[in-house]
């Protein structure tokens, strides 16, 4: 199963993601996200890893 998130906020070493379908918020370390992410980036979460859409 895969989910699509949008990065909405960066606060120090952490990011806030919003899941597109449910609107659920996720607070995650930037180190777990791909290089080059910024506010507004769409991310695919699949097989326990994030990739830029």
Question: Can you annotate each of these PLM segments?
Answer:
Residues 1-11:
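Structural detector for short beta-strands of small beta-barrel domains
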Residues 8, 46-47:
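Unusually extended, aromatic-enriched hydrophobic runs near protein termini
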Residues 13-16:
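Short aromatic-glycine-enriched beta-strand elements
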Residues 24-35:
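Beta-strand/loop nucleic-acid-binding surfaces
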Residues 48-53:
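Short, Lys/Arg- and Gly-enriched loop/turn segments at beta-strand edges
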